[in-house]
UniProtKB/Swiss-Prot annotation:
It comes from the Bacteria. The lineage of its organism: Bacteria, Pseudomonadati, Pseudomonadota, Gammaproteobacteria, Oceanospirillales. One of its GO terms (cellular component) is cytoplasm. This is Endoribonuclease YbeY. It comes from Chromohalobacter salexigens (strain ATCC BAA-138 / DSM 3043 / CIP 106854 / NCIMB 13768 / 1H11). Single strand-specific metallo-endoribonuclease involved in late-stage 70S ribosome quality control and in maturation of the 3' terminus of the 16S rRNA. One of its GO terms (molecular function) is RNA endonuclease activity. Zn(2+) binds at H116, H120, H126.
Length: 154
């Protein structure tokens, strides 16, 4: 299923470093291909500033700092089947800093963040060890499809 992605950019600089619409469709499409049972394929991906990320993280998670990706799954009212998956808010500054700190290409880290966030929209989590192992294994598999190495390797 081809994802329907509303790509939003809330940045005024460095927009040429952001993933393209085609990148997003490929990465999200790979996640959805592994989940053929879902008919939810519409989402928004918003590239945000550190200030917006911090405000969202504070308001929705109680953590007063910017973070790499926030996932907001859509929960349809009972009896109202919609194709909406949810929203991702990705902080460009944090992703750039993390990629540099981890010595990985920015595009690879963006792929990881989009795949990670999309898995959260589908209900995956990493609160306990078992869930984390399952989610991380799937992330590794999906990233390998794009010739991207293990993001959790030391």
């Amino acid at each position: 299923m081809t994802p329907d992605i509303d790509r939003q950019v809330a940045l005024e600089t460095a927009t040429e470093l952001l993933p393209t619409q085609a990148d997003l469709e490929a990465w999200v499409g790979a996640v959805l291909a592994r989940h053929p049972d879902t008919d939810r394929h519409e989402l928004s991906v918003r590239f945000v500033t550190a200030d917006e990320s911090q405000a969202l993280n504070r308001d929705y998670r109680g953590k007063d700092k910017p973070t790499n990706v926030l996932s907001f799954p859509f929960e349809a009212p009972p009896g109202l089947p919609l194709a909406l998956l949810g929203d991702l808010a990705i902080c460009h500054a944090v992703v750039v800093d993390e990629a540099a700190e981890q010595g990985k290409p920015l595009a690879h880290h963006y792929a990881h963040m989009v795949i990670h966030g999309t898995l959260h929209l589908l209900g995956y989590d990493h609160i306990d060890d078992r869930e984390a192992e399952e989610m991380e294994a799937l992330e590794r598999e999906l990233l390998a499809h794009f010739a991207i190495g293990d993001p959790y390797a030391e």
